[in-house]
């Protein structure tokens, strides 16, 4: 489109990048990647394809070369999170306060508060555990991703830093015709200083704080994934002893 400022990306129209220039209008301050995480596969999600990963690696190298050999600090946004986000959780027992059940590996988790802060209301529907997209590893190797933010899981809005130093988190839910309204409809704001973009600040703005009323959609919230937690806790309370026997 005539007024689109994004640079055409890989083989799909939804994977691209946008350069953000400094106040002089000439020097690149930072970069934004948008990655299409595609569709479902085998009951889970595929994550990005090899062609998209190849494009990202090439684009990262191109920007680095044009920046005097220094990686261009970048924020990355995509719908489905990478599976490495599970590294911010601690496995726990089902009756632990705040425990969340994961359908991916049938384990219970709580947020590791030494690594992340915010709401953790459902286990991430990340790319499949048995799929190796190589995306997260590429972020680490290229050294340009200063933050990766996701959507999809409406009951999550936490942000944390991985063991590799990459900030990962959720943007919060904005829609009013989807589950998770009881957790608050939000937008995530990013504040960056062109003199030091890596030291950026991000926070959520809540609909109820602006409008003085809570967003609620009882129908969709009834079928929220958080209901799974309640069902599984009842199941474990009744049959947990049998489950533990099978695990042994």
Residue ranges of each PLM-predicted region?
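Metal-dependent catalytic neighborhoods of phosphoester/phosphodiester hydrolases
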Residues: 1-3, 88, 159-164
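Membrane- and interface-active hydrophobic/amphipathic segments that mediate membrane binding, fusion
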Residues: 227-248
